[in-house]
């Protein structure tokens, strides 16, 4: 995981290929993690690979209805800020409290909406009825703001737009600036 930052830095300094394995971007809403990501020379995939066959990817929502995209929800509720956990903060050398303070201040420049803060918490506090997708629906969330969390991918797959402030796997489907929090990006549903 991200705790191997020093090993990754050595590999990069020596121009060695490495593979990073961590929790997958979707389908992990229960106690058991069914999906993982394997990334070459990075900790996240940065761009979709349209050159690869999509047959396996298309089979996933057929077997797991919880991750089937059902269209965009256009809710008029609060903004959900999903804070980065200690691992990405350490890896990217950011201070979580400073990030939260600056992010909230920036959001308030562009909206009067209520802001709900969600910290990562223990795994048992993040699955089932307590998962991000459940909160998005139950709290009628307008938009998610996060650093580079899997929460951006979960939001999009639930039909809620996301603002992801650092590079990550959901970049092609996210707004990248808080200034657009009131009118976030709703990509074409075919993407």
Predicted segments with their positions:
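Donor nucleotide-activated moiety binding/catalytic core segment of transferases
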Residues: 108, 113-167
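Conserved catalytic-core segment of nucleotide-activated headgroup transferases in glycan assembly
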Residues: 69-124
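A structural signal for short, well-ordered beta-strand segments and their strand-loop junctions
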Residues: 1, 9-12, 17-24, 80-82, ...
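Short, solvent-exposed loop/turn segments at secondary-structure junctions
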Residues: 2-4, 24-27, 84-88, 121-124, ...
């Amino acid at each position: 995981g991200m705790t191997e930052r020093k090993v990754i830095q050595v590999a990069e300094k020596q121009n060695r290929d490495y593979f990073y394995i961590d929790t997958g971007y979707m389908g992990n809403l229960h106690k058991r993690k069914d999906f993982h990501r394997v990334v070459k020379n990075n900790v996240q995939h940065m761009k979709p690979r349209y050159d690869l066959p999509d047959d396996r990817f298309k089979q996933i929502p057929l077997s797991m209805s919880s991750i089937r995209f059902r269209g965009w929800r256009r809710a008029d509720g609060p903004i959900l800020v999903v804070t980065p956990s200690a691992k990405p903060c350490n890896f990217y050398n950011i201070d979580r409290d400073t990030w939260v303070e600056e992010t909230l201040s920036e959001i308030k420049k562009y909206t009067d909406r209520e802001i709900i803060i969600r910290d990562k918490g223990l795994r048992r506090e993040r699955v089932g009825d307590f998962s991000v997708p459940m909160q998005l629906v139950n709290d009628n969330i307008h938009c998610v703001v996060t650093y580079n969390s899997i929460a951006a991918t979960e939001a999009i797959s639930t039909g809620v737009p996301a603002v992801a402030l650092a590079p990550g796997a959901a970049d092609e489907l996210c707004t990248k600036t808080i200034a657009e929090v009131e009118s976030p990006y709703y990509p074409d549903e075919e993407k």
